[in-house]
Amino acid sequence: MMHLLRRGAFAILLIVLLPSAALADLRLASWNIQHLGWNVGKDYPAVARIAAQFDFLAIQEVMNAEGIYRLRDTLEDATGAEWSVLYSDALGRNTYREKYAFLWREAAVEYVGGALTYIDEADRFAREPFSAVFRSRGTDQHFLAATVHITYGDRVADRVEEIEALRRYWDWLADVMPEYAGERILFGDFNLPPHHDGWASMRAVAEPLVTEGATTLSTHDRRYANLYDNLWVPKDHTLPLGDAGILPFPVVLSEVTGVYWDHEKARDRVSDHAPVYVLFEGNTLHDAVVAEIADQEAGCIDLNRASVSELTALPHIGEARAEAIKDGRPWNAVRDLKEIRGIGAGRLEEIKARGEACIEP
């Protein structure tokens, strides 16, 4: 069973300024919004600020219908736009169950139909994949969206078993909807990086859109641990794909709100996963977001490798202190900068809060 709900909305506060999606093409994303719907202190306005950067999201780890409705309502109140949601039944092998959801901006995307939960006769998946067909209102481009949350399990082998089963599911999608075979997109949290050997069967017919970076937030600010989230498309796809990447949402929230979001706060209040996205050709992310991504991708200032001039970009670090940092190498942790004359507790906290200084492995 699937559930589709749509409602009207009115504007209260614009949190982002995006071009009219109906006049451009789409921004598609996949996001594991950790335990969406549980009473765990989720900051729905913050989640909505990130979700509003896109026109369509495939969401994993939806714990109940109330959670996805609340996110939709927050998006509508914040953007003044109408958003719709389609979600699966609760899926799982035991008392722990999750839903999948598709969430989209009505001005940009139309639900075409064909919502299906995979009939997993071999019981290979703990949570069977969910799919539906959509189209861009601006260009009439159709796409068959499918989403899955691969089990983490007790061993990597548990994940590999499900990853290998994706090939049969991928072929099944083409069999049941052959008219959309070239327009399939598999959104998900796969709990396995795309270069792992377990993907061999899928790699024969499909390709990941994100191959560099990482999507899971580490406990260290501005550091990401694993590339688990991704989007897969057919090798012979007919989709108008543009840029794809990872949205480092703690950086974006820090910029948009004016309040620093460290990884501890981001993991507790939003998610321990960053969204991955793909843009259809002719589209871009919001300019401020693009700038922040560029800053993030530019990398941090490594205390053990940066030049004196690069070190002076850090707060409270002039040429003399930069020379002292260079002379004090190797550094084991950013907190050790307190050994530099003139860097007291307050200045050290500001350096750490900016998230620009690091110790690269």
UniProtKB/Swiss-Prot annotation:
Its cofactor is Mg(2+); Ca(2+). This is Deoxyribonuclease. Thioalkalivibrio sp. K90mix is adapted to extreme salt concentrations and grows at salinities up to 4 M of NaCl. Its EC number is 3.1.-.-. Its main location: secreted. Requires Ca(2+) or Mg(2+) for catalytic activity and the maximum activity is achieved when both of these ion species are present. It is found in: Secreted. Residues 1-24 form the signal peptide. It comes from the Bacteria. GO terms for biological process: DNA catabolic process; DNA repair. Pfam families: Exo_endo_phos, HHH_3. The active site is at H149. It is an enzyme of class 3 (hydrolase). Harbors two domains: an N-terminal domain, that exhibits DNase activity, and a C-terminal domain, comprising a duplicate DNA binding helix-hairpin-helix motif. The C-terminal domain is responsible for the enzyme's resistance to high ionic strength, it acts as a facilitator for DNA binding at high salt concentrations. Belongs to the DNase I family. GO terms for cellular component: extracellular region. InterPro entries: DNase_I (IPR016202), Endo/exonu/phosph_ase_sf (IPR036691), Endo/exonuclease/phosphatase (IPR005135), Hlx-hairpin-Hlx_DNA-bd_motif (IPR003583), RuvA_2-like (IPR010994). DNA nuclease able to digest short and long DNA substrate. Is resistant to ionic strength and thus active at high salt concentration. GO terms for molecular function: DNA binding; DNA nuclease activity.
